[in-house]
């Protein structure tokens, strides 16, 4: 069998030079250089080749009360990624090579969704003004929901931002969190999905489920059953959505994260539900590097690949379907 090609649909990138834009101060395990240099070094395998990545914004520091003036950090973050693509990296930002310049296939910057459609449009125009030559790789936007208070996503301004993205052909990377947030996030999200059903939502990390639930008794767990009902409704409501098979290492206990077999066992019940919904055409692989490398350690992409292979083996998935999930489905999801 030939090696699999991978389009890693969820990685974060930053250097020590621009880490002040982010929340990861010294002492945070994510502090440091997390550039394409480090990603490539930690994504080697005899079983696959990473042929592309989708860059996802890092939740930069912002001040929405200042309008566009309070959004300089995510704009600078976008410009850093543009320098990775055009080969004009600053000395402390890494070493540019032809391979690295073509590795980023799509960009998903931050968008100020609570500011409404007018605020998002003004911000997107600012991105284009600051760098237009690489803007064609901006395929959508993200604004993390997982750590926000109730009623954030259901606010009329937020809904109008979704409508603007839909009208302009962008995707939205959706980050909600069952384990640390709660099922109320799913209920609010579902209500918004009903208002803007046709936007292409890319749902992150299997919805960050409670992977500490006992897999042996999970089928009778009321929270698992409620989650299953809600994600089923979410799937039915959004005909253009995709699900990322990613993020598992961050949701299990540390001792589990260090063992591929144990991680696979805890992920399986949740994977089975979402795969029966989104299926072989709308499921996409992602490593969530470097976030998931904190619990899993070095060679994250290889380890998560092994988890996925175990999951795929458990349902008898054929090789052609695996190739879709690892590679070609992400091209469709992100309009690449």
Curated annotation (Swiss-Prot):
A GO BP term, please? Answer: rhamnose catabolic process
Does S-adenosyl-L-methionine appear among the keywords? no
Q: What is its EC number?
A: 3.1.1.65
Is Cell wall biogenesis/degradation given among the entry's keywords?
no
Query: Any idea which UniProt keywords this protein has?
Result: Hydrolase, Metal-binding, Rhamnose metabolism
Q: Which cofactor does it need?
A: a divalent metal cation
One annotated GO molecular function: L-rhamnono-1,4-lactonase activity
What binding details are noted for the cofactor?
A: Divalent metal cation.
Q: What does the UniProt function comment say about this protein?
A: Hydrolase with high substrate specificity for L-rhamnono-1,4-lactone. Catalyzes the second step in an alternative pathway for rhamnose utilization that does not involve phosphorylated intermediates.
- Read off the PANTHER family from this record: AMIDOHYDROLASE, AMIDOHYDROLASE-RELATED DOMAIN-CONTAINING PROTEIN
Official protein name in the record: L-rhamnono-gamma-lactonase
Traced from the root, the source organism's taxonomic lineage reads: Eukaryota, Fungi, Dikarya, Ascomycota, Saccharomycotina
* Gene for this chain: LRA2
């Amino acid at each position: 069998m030939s090696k699999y090609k991978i389009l890693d649909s969820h990685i974060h990138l930053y250097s020590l030079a621009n880490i002040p834009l982010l929340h990861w101060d010294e002492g945070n395990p994510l502090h440091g250089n997390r550039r394409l240099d480090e990603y490539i070094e930690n994504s080697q395998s005899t079983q696959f080749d990473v042929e592309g990545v989708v860059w996802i914004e890092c939740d930069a520091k912002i001040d929405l009360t200042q309008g566009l003036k309070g959004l300089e950090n995510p704009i600078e973050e976008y410009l850093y990624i543009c320098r990775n693509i055009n080969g004009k990296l600053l000395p402390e930002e890494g070493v540019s090579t032809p391979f690295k310049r073509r590795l980023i296939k799509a960009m998903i910057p931050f968008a100020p969704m609570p500011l409404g459609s007018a605020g998002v449009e003004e911000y997107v125009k600012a991105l284009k003004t600051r760098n237009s030559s690489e803007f064609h790789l901006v395929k959508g936007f993200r604004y993390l929901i997982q750590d926000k208070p109730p009623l954030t996503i259901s606010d009329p301004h937020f809904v109008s931002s979704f409508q603007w993205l839909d009208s302009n052909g962008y995707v939205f990377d959706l980050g909600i969190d069952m384990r640390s947030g709660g099922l109320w996030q799913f209920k609010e999200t579902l209500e918004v999905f009903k208002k803007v059903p046709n936007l292409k939502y890319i749902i992150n990390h299997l919805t960050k489920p409670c992977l500490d639930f006992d897999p042996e008794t999970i089928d009778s767990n009321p929270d698992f059953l409620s989650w299953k009902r809600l994600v089923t409704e979410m799937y039915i409501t959004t005909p253009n959505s995709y699900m990322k098979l990613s993020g598992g290492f961050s949701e299990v206990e540390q001792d589990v994260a260090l063992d591929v077999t144990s991680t696979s066992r805890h992920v399986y019940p949740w994977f089975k539900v979402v795969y029966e919904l989104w299926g072989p055409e709308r499921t996409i692989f992602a490593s969530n590097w470097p976030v998931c490398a904190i619990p899993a350690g070095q060679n994250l992409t290889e380890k998560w690949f092994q988890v996925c292979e175990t999951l795929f083996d458990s349902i008898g998935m054929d090789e052609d379907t695996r190739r879709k999930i690892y590679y070609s489905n992400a091209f469709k999801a992100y309009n690449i």
